[in-house]
């Protein structure tokens, strides 16, 4: 039994095509494998935790007597997005996919937004959040139109200048869009208000961003932990992904390295339960942008922080490192890839080591539930008794 579990999701760090990759157009994808081959990876601490034993990675040693336990996990849900991956890690099987809109949103949805808001919509395509205000910000100021855009994730974002559209009005419009896109035919995971300020050529997004997410489609192990008096400390995007459900404390982060800093602060305080950290830069800055070298450096930077994380662990802490999907930066397009994800498990009190049987994302939730003696979901098999 562990008093605390520290679960770190390396967002999009997949480890080879999943058995159903063909359904997603992702045959041949391999985030870690292709990064190792094309850019090289110097990751001695992840090696020592057994990463190289899960699948062959060019230049990464398969350390037979590694610390802790290693395996790979398969996703059973129908999506390959962030919310689906995290929700499955916490015990849900998502049977309806969230939708992405690589060609923009349908005209009928835009018309509903225009009719409700009394404002026109511009852009309506995937765009970087900073580039979209550079390109459309001045037009928005002159016309009062709504800048509606998306990304490779199932999100609809609305940008508006705070001096042109008051925050309350922007929030009201986003709430309306949230209400009409929860179900088929849209199934959009998040609506995001993206206010900005400044003058043409010098626009900046403000901290008044607001996310309109969805509650998970069922009871997760986070809910079980919270209901039974355990701490559930969310670091990074986790609170947004679960819409606050099952979370007892939420900490925002600015980057991967800030995320590690925040996690270390959490680890150095007294609590019983789960710390749940998402490190998003792998996905947001390097995966979608197909930046192989940047992705490799980000993995190496995380590897360099692992000794600090392990030093901060108490004797009865368990560290779990995994991912939520793939995002192979060598693959065509800009979207996530359907892949296995790694699982590394380490505790200072382990007296043995080795590989765990290959499993499923929700095995993590089943293991955490068994450890804290709280109800699990119907999905997943606990590997707790194999961590010796």
Curated annotation (Swiss-Prot):
Its EC number is 5.4.2.7. It holds the Pfam family Metalloenzyme. It is found in: Cytoplasm. HAMAP family: Phosphopentomut (MF_00740). Binds 2 manganese ions. PANTHER family: PHOSPHOPENTOMUTASE (PTHR21110:SF0). Pathway: Carbohydrate degradation; 2-deoxy-D-ribose 1-phosphate degradation; D-glyceraldehyde 3-phosphate and acetaldehyde from 2-deoxy-alpha-D-ribose 1-phosphate: step 1/2. Isomerase that catalyzes the conversion of deoxy-ribose 1-phosphate (dRib-1-P) and ribose 1-phosphate (Rib-1-P) to deoxy-ribose 5-phosphate (dRib-5-P) and ribose 5-phosphate (Rib-5-P), respectively. One of its GO terms (biological process) is 5-phosphoribose 1-diphosphate biosynthetic process. SUPFAM superfamilies: Alkaline phosphatase-like, DeoB insert domain-like. One of its GO terms (cellular component) is cytosol. InterPro entries: Alkaline_phosphatase_core_sf, DeoB, Metalloenzyme, Phosphopentomutase_DeoB_cap_sf. Mn(2+) 2 binds at residues 283, 288, 336. Signal peptide: none annotated. It catalyses: 2-deoxy-alpha-D-ribose 1-phosphate = 2-deoxy-D-ribose 5-phosphate; alpha-D-ribose 1-phosphate = D-ribose 5-phosphate. Its cofactor is Mn(2+). NCBIfam families: deoB, PRK05362.1. This is Phosphopentomutase. GO terms for molecular function: magnesium ion binding; manganese ion binding; phosphopentomutase activity. Belongs to the phosphopentomutase family. Mn(2+) 1 binds at residues 11, 324-325. Keywords: Cytoplasm, Isomerase, Manganese, Metal-binding. CDD domains: PPM. The gene is deoB.
């Amino acid at each position: 039994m562990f008093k605390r579990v520290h679960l770190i999701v390396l967002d999009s760090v997949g480890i080879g095509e999943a058995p159903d990759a063909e359904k997603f157009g992702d045959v041949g994808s391999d985030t870690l494998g292709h990064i190792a081959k094309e850019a090289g990876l110097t990751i001695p601490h992840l090696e020592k935790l057994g990463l190289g034993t899960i699948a062959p990675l060019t230049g990464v040693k398969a350390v037979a007597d590694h610390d802790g336990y290693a395996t790979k996990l398969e996703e059973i849900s129908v999506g390959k997005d962030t919310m689906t991956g995290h929700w499955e890690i916490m015990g849900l099987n998502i049977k309806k996919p969230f939708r992405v809109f690589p060609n923009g949103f349908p005209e009928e949805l835009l018309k509903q937004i225009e009719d409700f808001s009394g404002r026109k919509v511009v852009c309506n395509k995937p765009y970087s959040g900073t580039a979209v205000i550079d390109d459309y910000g001045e037009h928005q100021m002159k016309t009062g139109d709504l800048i509606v855009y998306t990304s490779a994730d199932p999100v609809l974002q609305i940008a508006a200048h705070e001096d042109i559209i008051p925050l309350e009005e922007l929030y009201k419009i986003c709430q309306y869009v949230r209400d009409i896109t929860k179900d088929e035919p849209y199934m959009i995971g998040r609506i995001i208000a993206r206010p900005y300020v400044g003058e043409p050529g010098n626009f900046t997004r403000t901290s008044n961003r607001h996310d309109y997410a969805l509650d998970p489609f069922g009871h997760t192990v986070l809910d079980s932990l919270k209901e039974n008096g355990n701490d559930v400390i969310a670091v990074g995007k986790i609170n947004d992904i679960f819409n606050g459900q099952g979370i007892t404390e939420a900490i925002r982060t600015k980057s991967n390295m800030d995320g590690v800093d925040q996690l270390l602060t959490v680890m150095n305080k007294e609590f019983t339960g789960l710390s749940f950290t998402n490190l998003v830069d792998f996905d947001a800055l390097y995966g979608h942008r197909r930046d192989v070298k940047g992705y490799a450096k980000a993995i190496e930077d995380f590897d360099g922080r692992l000794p600090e994380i392990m030093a901060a662990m108490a004797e009865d802490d368990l560290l779990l490192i995994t991912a939520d999907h793939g995002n192979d930066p060598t693959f065509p397009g800009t979207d996530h890839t359907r892949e296995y994800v790694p699982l590394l498990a380490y505790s200072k009190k382990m007296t043995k080591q080795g590989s765990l049987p290959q499993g499923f994302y929700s095995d993590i939730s089943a293991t955490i539930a068994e450890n804290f003696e709280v109800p699990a979901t119907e999905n997943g098999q606990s590997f707790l008794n194999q961590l010796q």
